[in-house]
Design a protein with these regions (language model features):
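Short beta-strand segments
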Residues: 33-35, 76, 114-116, 174-175
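Glycine-rich phosphate-binding loop
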Residues: 156-175
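Glycine-rich phosphate/diphosphate-binding loop of Rossmann-like nucleotide-binding domains
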Residues: 92, 97-152, 156
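Noncatalytic linker/hinge segments flanking ATPase motor cores
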Residues: 63-65, 71-79, 116, 147-159
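Extended, charged alpha/beta regions that create polyanion-binding interfaces
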Residues: 2-106
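Short glycine-/small-residue-rich flexible loop motifs, especially phosphate/cofactor-binding loops
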Residues: 9-12, 134, 161
Length: 175
């Protein structure tokens, strides 16, 4: 038999991967917290198998979600005060060798935006969408470093994309 805190620590080992750290164990519960901004992923099938073991649980954010440094990713706990070690061994076997959770850092750092449309290009209407795109990019740690206006002319748009690619931005967005 194991105390709930020891059991929670074993569950943490099942789930934790790099780019995250644990909270202190308290009353049989540990939380995992993101160390970086990135994409949070959960092996949902193996998590289901682990959670099928009685008297333990691991709750996570949804898989494939953007997270920020400091966000809580998961909480795990042993439900009774003491737990049969065989249940934790069963959970460890269900989890396999790889951790259940992963935070992958964002790889894209810079973006260029090409705003298309003859009305915007000629100044007949104001471009109100580019600031929205820029804010959305910033939420993922991506800086918009280039912005180009193009008419609806296909050759002009094609040339703008080629120029943007040559400039070395990580991401090109056409609106």
């Amino acid at each position: 038999m194991l105390h709930e805190d020891e059991g929670a620590e074993r569950l943490r080992k099942i789930a934790q991967n790099e780019n995250m750290h644990p909270s202190e164990v308290k009353e049989g519960k540990i939380e995992l917290i993101a160390d970086i901004d990135g994409l949070f992923q959960v092996d949902v099938g193996r998590l289901y198998d682990v959670n099928s073991v009685d008297e333990i649980m691991i709750a996570t954010r949804h898989t494939n979600m953007a997270v920020r440094k400091g966000d809580k990713l998961a909480g795990m706990r042993v439900i009774p005060l003491v737990i049969d070690e065989k249940k934790l061994e069963e959970a460890e076997k269900a989890a396999g060798k790889e951790p259940l959770l992963k935070v992958t850092p964002w790889k894209l750092k810079t973006a260029g935006v090409i705003t298309t449309g003859s009305e915007v290009y000629k100044g007949l209407i104001k471009d109100q969408f580019t600031p929205v795109v820029e804010k959305k990019l910033e939420a993922f740690g991506i800086q918009m470093i280039k912005h180009v206006l193009c008419s609806d002319d296909m050759e002009m748009i094609t040339q703008a994309i080629a120029d943007m690619k040559k400039s070395g931005v990580d991401l090109i967005i056409c609106t």
